[in-house]
Swiss-Prot record:
SMART domains: OMPdecase (SM00934). This is Orotidine 5'-phosphate decarboxylase. Pfam families: OMPdecase. Substrate binds at residues 8, 30, 59-68, 118, 178, 187, 207-208. Catalyzes the decarboxylation of orotidine 5'-monophosphate (OMP) to uridine 5'-monophosphate (UMP). Homodimer. Belongs to the OMP decarboxylase family. Type 1 subfamily. It comes from Sulfurimonas denitrificans (strain ATCC 33889 / DSM 1251). It is an enzyme of class 4 (lyase). Keywords: Decarboxylase, Lyase, Pyrimidine biosynthesis. InterPro entries: Aldolase_TIM, OMPdecase, OMPdecase_AS, OMPdecase_bac, OMPdeCOase_dom, RibuloseP-bd_barrel.
Length: 227
């Protein structure tokens, strides 16, 4: 299991300051919508200047018609990131088109599909998708697996089931990890590190418990000890 640190601070400068404090740790860095829209490709380059060995997960959750998603995926290749994601609800045709397009490249990033956002509760999710989170997450994961993707974004509660219906090597990345029982904020389906580990999660994403800490490096050290 690997740790991915969410770079969700209000400014580029604050994110870079955080990265500087944790530069000696073997962790992934997650660049989300706000940070990428605000700071762009230059931010990705600045990360590599601090530590060229950092691996970057570009969390943009692509969702569009198949050709547009595939075009965007090709553009992401040029950014040199190590992982990005799409929405599974865009459908199998869109996901397949993304993977077919990426076959042109000798080296491509890991591609994950978002199943159910961890901010959803059962009631909200059911009104939109007409089914339970667990059933729909399994279906989305199966669609992603059959479309040739490398894994999915899901909560820790769906990870074991998804691996059972796909493959043990099919990756799961879980946001909403609260390693020391912190407030869950706007996340609904949260878990701790031990639960994620027992669910055979491949990547855990931790944000607020790290960047809100006075000593983020120490928090990372403690999380890595649990991993």
């Amino acid at each position: 299991m690997q740790l991915c640190v969410a770079l969700d601070l209000p400014t580029k400068e604050e994110n870079l300051e955080l990265i500087g404090k944790i530069k000696d740790y073997d962790v992934w860095l997650k660049v989300g919508l706000r940070s990428y829209i605000r700071d762009g490709e230059d931010f990705l380059k600045d990360i590599k200047k601090i530590n060229p060995d950092f691996k970057i997960f570009l969390d943009l959750k692509l969702y569009d018609i198949p050709n547009t998603m595939a075009d965007a995926a090709e553009s992401i290749i040029s950014l040199g990131v190590d992982m990005f994601n799409v929405h599974a609800s865009a459908g199998k045709r869109a996901m397949r088109e993304v993977m077919v397009r990426l076959e042109r490249y000798e080296k491509r990033p890991i591609v994950l599909a978002v199943t159910a956002l961890t901010s959803f509760n059962e009631d909200e999710f059911g009104k939109i998708y007409g089914d339970s989170i667990s059933k729909k997450a399994d279906q989305f994961a199966k669609d992603a697996y059959e479309s040739g993707l490398d894994g999915v974004v899901c909560s820790a509660y769906e990870s074991s089931s998804i691996k059972n219906i796909t493959n043990r090597d099919f990756m799961t990345l879980t946001p909403g990890i609260r390693p020391f029982g912190e407030d869950s904020g706007d996340q609904q389906r949260v878990a701790d590190v031990a639960f994620a580990k027992n669910a055979h999660v491949d990547f855990i994403v931790v944000g607020r418990p790290i960047y809100n800490s006075k000593n983020p490096a120490e928090v990372i050290r403690r999380i890595l000890e649990q991993i």
